[in-house]
Amino acid sequence: MNIKYDVQKIEKQAQKYWKEKKSFEVIEDYSKEKYYCLSMFPYPSGRLHMGHVRNYSIGDVISRFQRMQGKNVMQPIGWDGFGLPAENAALKNKESPAKWTYKNINYMKTQLNQLGFGYDWAREITTCHPKYYRWEQWLFIKLFKKNLIYKKKAIVNWDPVDQTVLANEQVINGRGWRSNALIEKKEISQWFIRITNYAEELLNDLDKLYGWPDPVKIMQKNWIGKSIGLEITFSRRNSDPLIIYTTRPDTLMGVTYLAISFEHPLALESGKNNYQVQSFIEKCKTIQTSEILNEIMDKKGIDSGFKCIHPITNNEVPIWITNFVLMSYGTGAIMSVPAHDKRDFKFAKKYGIFIKQVINKNESIDKGPIINKGKLFNSEEFSGMDFNQAYESIAKTLIEKNLGNKKINYRLRDWGISRQRYWGCPIPIVNCKYCGSVTVKVKDLPVILPEKVKFYDVSSPIKKMPNFYQTICPKCGSKAHRETDTFDTFFESSWYFARHTCNNNNNAMLDKRVNYWLEVDQYIGGVEHSILHLLYARFFNKLLRDEGLIKYDEPFKNLLTQGMVLKNGVKMSKSKGNTVDPTKMIKKYGADTVRLFILFAAPPMQDLEWNNSGLEGAHRFIKKVYRLVSIYINDSKDYIVNHLNINFLNKTQKHIRRKIHQNLVKITDDINRRYTFNTAISTLMESVDIINKFTKTDTQSIALRSESINIILLTLSPITPHICHYLWLKLGNKKAIINEPWPKVDLKALIESEVQIIIQVDGKLRDKMMMMINTDKEILESEVLSNKNIIKFTKNKNIIKIIIIHNKLINIVTK
């Protein structure tokens, strides 16, 4: 065997074998336990980055390990093909988004193969291909007919850079999730899907996700934002009432003003005849009003001049127009209780509004509001009640007066799914002046997005293409216009996990194979997708279930959220100029080294700091394994390597074998249960060092080295598959290591024949001795008392008694 580690030759040989043998292609096999491992598919941006490499290395280790457990493992891959970067590249490079996207897919596919990931390429999907997106158009039509899809004018989040609408979930700290531009508010006709119809189920089913990290579930729970409260009507003389929602009806008697959104119809009415109000509203329109930004922005308002009637006291309450109440949340109006709310308190102090305390009589509001619940006072017939009593009593009173009712509210809003961009799935709607919005006939699907387009600015080219948008109404046959908005790209990524199971079915969205493979046993991706993608995918899963296409309530049984890859303490990004090209690292060190380092440098759930010295260390370890096997092959060439006979092992050999099998137990647990691949690798390194030092060449030693090296290669193979494939065959094995099972622990090897005994004199540690397990008391005492060190500490002393803790400790008590 060549003593030189030729990394490029070895890795190409392994990859050629897997490709020719179709090692990772699978079909449904009901005689085996299935295992579906899926990493979040990449956007084809042009090059893989180290975040991709980390994500997919984790998935590959899990997949290969589960395969070695005898399971029928599917690990597919695909491409999240639609998106704004393709349009930006089209403007910059003067090439179509389609050409740019498919070119990137080809390059990134080569990179994935160079890294040795065990994907079933026969299940590859590309979301920008009509074969894929025709089925989400089909689903859209189904949902439209069930009234789960609707169109309305709405105040939306408008990204001025990307020139498109963003869902609430896509606004991060008041900025666009892609462009980072400050988001504006704009009224526009939008398509929505009724995700709120599933709010309760999405919330309750979080309890079924035992294999999900708690922080992700908490984020989704908070985003859905269920609250239980009262809907209260504040009447207005000779006008429509204001309806508000509150979770603190116990503070109702402390209401001293109502706050409404500057977009509220009442605010607009007030502004018609009041220049100051009109000016205030215009200023509000220019500021950013995302929910998160509202927490830090300066709270401003103006008296509308209108008043409403308190539902219990019948006193008049002023209505203030504000810049912080969201029209998109509830009714766009809230009751304000400055004595018991921080924001209301500051606002009231700022504008000199009356403050009325109604909770906890013995506490003062001089320094600030009283937020906590307590006993009511100054509240007429409700005085003296606690929160629960007041809640029920006030609710009863309001219901009797027909001025209120109990209500469950959600923070979650219906998902705005239309985008004013080109590179997305066409919405299968025809707009007819006679029939309104009409769905395309199913037989006419897919509505194909024209791919040969030219970009002159950020606007969508299909809006200027009559040959695309001019059509006939499917209902009445009149001339009509095709919808030129496209789906939010999260539409595609919300169901791809299911399509992987039957991607070659051209006659149906899904077929019975989906119920063999789902649920996804292990899903892997970044925690930044907790609210967006993961919530939408759960929602789509329920839509597909209700269409009778799948039988499961949830798509992902277990979720692993890996940390980011950092360099110099910050996330790798092109803008920061701190990226590392995986292809260059593969050419220099090999794919196995890159995989090993990225799995060893940190636990998968934590951020990983990239450093070249760590990469060098990983490369040295692989070369050490290569040399270990090379030396063994040379040492054993004159032997017929027999199965190990444990009855003939000497003390040293038994100790080495015990340690190898103890390490096997730990490695198995680290990979299978704990997903701490870094500690599994550390233990593997320990095993390599043990066998490296054990160079004896007698028959039993050769057999022990053979067993140990086999265990090392088998357990290392999911992590560094290329070198293990090569060395396994060099050892003379007939089957490739990819087809071998995980090694079994010999429980007998774990049994200790000796134990370490702690020896104390008068409670102080004086020595340690190795003794046979369950040594007789008389023999143990004799051995200890004849120990030179113990003789020194007991000299000229009377031994009163000897205390023995079985197989652990002996304490000699003297006087």
Swiss-Prot record:
It comes from the Bacteria. A motif ('KMSKS' region) lies at residues 571-575. The keyword Lyase does not apply. Keywords: Aminoacyl-tRNA synthetase, ATP-binding, Cytoplasm, Ligase, Nucleotide-binding, Protein biosynthesis. The keyword Thylakoid does not apply. It is an enzyme of class 6 (ligase). It catalyses: tRNA(Leu) + L-leucine + ATP = L-leucyl-tRNA(Leu) + AMP + diphosphate. InterPro entries: aa-tRNA-synth_I_CS, aa-tRNA-synth_Ia, Leu-tRNA-ligase, Leu_tRNA-synth_edit, M/V/L/I-tRNA-synth_anticd-bd, Methionyl/Leucyl_tRNA_Synth, Rossmann-like_a/b/a_fold, tRNAsynth_Ia_anticodon-bd. A motif ('HIGH' region) lies at residues 42-52. GO terms for molecular function: aminoacyl-tRNA deacylase activity; ATP binding; leucine-tRNA ligase activity. It holds the Pfam family tRNA-synt_1_2. Its main location: cytoplasm. One of its GO terms (biological process) is leucyl-tRNA aminoacylation. ATP binds at residue 574. SUPFAM superfamilies: Anticodon-binding domain of a subclass of class I aminoacyl-tRNA synthetases, Nucleotidylyl transferase, ValRS/IleRS/LeuRS editing domain. CDD domains: Anticodon_Ia_Leu_BEm, LeuRS_core. It is found in: Cytoplasm. GO terms for cellular component: cytosol. Its EC number is 6.1.1.4. Belongs to the class-I aminoacyl-tRNA synthetase family. HAMAP family: Leu_tRNA_synth_B. This is Leucine--tRNA ligase. It comes from Vesicomyosocius okutanii subsp. Calyptogena okutanii (strain HA).
